[in-house]
């Protein structure tokens, strides 16, 4: 027979072994959970880095798009100003202007050396010579400040009646903003259907 004292120690050792096995299993489970957590955390960090990079890329693209939009808007304003200036001249003269670059100095008429003399030339093909209609300077090559404020420009291309109407309608506007408003007003109120049709045909070419 086993002595009670020896049996007690055997039972105690057996219980300790069982507890150690339980602790070892718990430690294994904890390590597995830790490994799983670390993998999940690393995946989260990787996804976060990817998301942060995507956000930065989107921000860069947005800034690039904004810069491109500002460039397009600036170019559009300049082109619109040129078109409106051409429309104003077309309304006065009724014919499109040749695309010839001229300066303000060239645009000013030179005094005639002899107003009494007339230039004569022999008629050709039995047709009587006629004085050609003088085309004004192509306003497309005036600067924006000249379009909007030049007295020479206004006197050369706008009648006094139209100048008075525009001054009254758009006294609170200046610069390119006023030019656009004047052009739109003249297109809507001053252009005939025939002139509008002519402009649309010209812009299709």
UniProtKB/Swiss-Prot annotation:
Localisation per UniProt entry: Host cytoplasm
Induction, as annotated: Expressed in the early phase of the viral replicative cycle.
Region Disordered, annotated ranges: 108-141
GO process terms (BP): symbiont-mediated activation of host autophagy
Coiled coil residues, start to end: 10-75
Top-level taxon: Viruses
Entry keyword Zinc-finger: no
Main subcellular location of this protein, as a coarse class: host cell
Biased composition (Polar residues): 111-141
Keyword list, A-Z: Activation of host autophagy by virus, Coiled coil, Early protein, Host cytoplasm, Host-virus interaction
Keyword Cell membrane (UniProt): no
Functional note: Induces host endoplasmic reticulum stress and consequently activates autophagy and NF-kappa-B signaling pathway. In turn, may induce autophagy-mediated STING1 degradation and innate immune evasion.
Family: Belongs to the asfivirus K205R family.
Name of the protein described by the UniProt record: Uncharacterized protein K205R
Organism for this UniProt entry: African swine fever virus (isolate Warthog/Namibia/Wart80/1980)
């Amino acid at each position: 027979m086993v002595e009670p004292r020896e049996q007690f120690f055997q039972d105690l050792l057996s219980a300790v072994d069982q507890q150690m096995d339980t602790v070892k299993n718990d430690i294994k489970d904890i390590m597995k959970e830790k490994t799983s957590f670390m993998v999940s955390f690393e995946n989260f960090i990787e996804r976060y880095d990817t998301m942060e990079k995507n956000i930065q890329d989107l921000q860069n693209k947005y800034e690039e798009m904004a810069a491109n939009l500002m460039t397009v808007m600036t170019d559009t304003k300049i082109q619109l100003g040129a078109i409106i200036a051409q429309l104003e001249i077309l309304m006065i003269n009724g014919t499109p202007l040749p695309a010839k670059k001229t300066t303000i100095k060239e645009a000013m008429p030179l005094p005639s050396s002899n107003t009494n003399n007339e230039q004569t030339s022999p008629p050709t093909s039995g047709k009587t010579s006629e004085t050609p209609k003088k085309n004004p300077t192509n306003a497309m090559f005036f600067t924006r400040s000249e379009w909007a404020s030049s007295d020479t420009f206004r006197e050369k291309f706008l009648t006094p009646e139209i100048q008075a109407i525009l001054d009254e309608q758009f006294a609170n506007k200046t610069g390119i903003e006023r030019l656009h408003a004047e052009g739109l007003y003249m297109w809507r109120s001053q252009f005939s259907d025939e002139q509008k049709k002519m402009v649309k045909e010209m812009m299709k070419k």
